[in-house]
């Protein structure tokens, strides 16, 4: 799959989607995008910046949602112009899709909306690559149905990625079944692993979600070892002060050391090949 000017697939080095959960300010987005661009250039990683203009599925109605569509898109345009990196953001309503697709390079669908047929149809026909997140409630094999919905309407465009972000495991907890990454390859789409939302504890702090940040590198290494096309990580210079998902965000100043390990592991795994595919 051609993605933001590079090839994405299991036969390529993994690409990275990374940034703060919420676009808290223009300066934060520029700082994170600039830092990650430099890190990824040193490590030879294709990089896509991510942030959200609206967190429409917060645990509590009193939680901060974001700066909104207009300001968010203005900030994303500045990231593209000043930093020179592609931008991904998530859309939560069909009405937002045209405006978002006119600005950003990649659209993402929230996990909770992966079975909403009209929504999937709308985002699949927006003319941009789409990262479809697997719902926490969905079996990995069921993502084929989701991808089939997208392909029904996108005129054969090779623009769909699928993303694993953990599965519900009792109340307020998620678990990552690494088999799902191999199973989701059967969709024929590049598979992305979300290493930070996978350690989230949904609603675990009452009115907000908790998280187990210490397990981010554990799951990231495991996913790379299985074999993936892309890695998704939320990062923040001060996770404790992040507007959202701070407990499961990886500190910005620790990204390079973790990514260096993952690059070496990715190279070793892909050089050796995958026995299950032989």
Curated annotation (Swiss-Prot):
It is an enzyme of class 2 (transferase). GO terms for molecular function: 3-deoxy-8-phosphooctulonate synthase activity. Pathway: Carbohydrate biosynthesis; 3-deoxy-D-manno-octulosonate biosynthesis; 3-deoxy-D-manno-octulosonate from D-ribulose 5-phosphate: step 2/3; Bacterial outer membrane biogenesis; lipopolysaccharide biosynthesis. Keywords: Cytoplasm, Lipopolysaccharide biosynthesis, Transferase. Its EC number is 2.5.1.55. This is 2-dehydro-3-deoxyphosphooctonate aldolase. It catalyses: D-arabinose 5-phosphate + phosphoenolpyruvate + H2O = 3-deoxy-alpha-D-manno-2-octulosonate-8-phosphate + phosphate. Belongs to the KdsA family. InterPro entries: Aldolase_TIM, DAHP1/KDSA, KDO8P_synthase. GO terms for biological process: keto-3-deoxy-D-manno-octulosonic acid biosynthetic process. One of its GO terms (cellular component) is cytoplasm. It comes from Dechloromonas aromatica (strain RCB). It is found in: Cytoplasm. SUPFAM superfamilies: Aldolase (SSF51569). It holds the Pfam family DAHP_synth_1. Gene3D superfamilies: Aldolase class I (3.20.20.70). The gene is kdsA.
């Amino acid at each position: 799959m051609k993605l933001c000017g590079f090839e994405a697939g299991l036969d390529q080095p993994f690409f990275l989607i990374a940034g703060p959960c919420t676009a808290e300010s223009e300066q934060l987005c520029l700082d994170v995008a600039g830092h990650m661009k430099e890190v990824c250039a040193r490590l030879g990683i294709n990089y896509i910046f991510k942030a959200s203009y609206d967190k429409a599925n917060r645990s509590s109605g009193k939680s901060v949602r974001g700066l909104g569509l207009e300001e968010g898109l203005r900030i994303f345009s500045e990231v593209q112009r000043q930093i020179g990196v592609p931008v991904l953001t998530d859309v939560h309503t069909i009405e937002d899709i045209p405006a978002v697709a006119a600005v950003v390079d990649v659209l993402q669908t929230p996990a909770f909306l992966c079975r909403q047929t009209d929504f999937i149809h709308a985002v699949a026909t927006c003319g941009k690559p789409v990262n479809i997140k697997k719902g926490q409630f969905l079996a990995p094999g069921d993502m084929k149905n989701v991808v089939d919905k997208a392909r029904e309407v996108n005129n054969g465009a090779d623009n769909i990625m699928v993303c694993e972000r953990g599965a519900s495991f009792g109340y307020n907890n998620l678990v990552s079944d690494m088999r799902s990454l191999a199973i989701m390859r059967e969709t024929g789409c590049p598979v992305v692993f979300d290493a930070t939302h996978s350690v989230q504890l949904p609603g675990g702090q009452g009115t907000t979600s908790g998280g187990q940040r210490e397990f981010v590198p554990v799951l990231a290494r495991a996913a790379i070892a299985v074999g993936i096309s892309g890695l998704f990580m939320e990062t923040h210079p001060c996770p404790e002060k992040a507007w959202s998902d701070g407990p499961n965000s990886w500190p910005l100043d620790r990204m390079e050391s973790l990514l260096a390990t993952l690059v070496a592991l990715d190279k070793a795994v892909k050089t050796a090949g995958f026995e299950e595919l032989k």
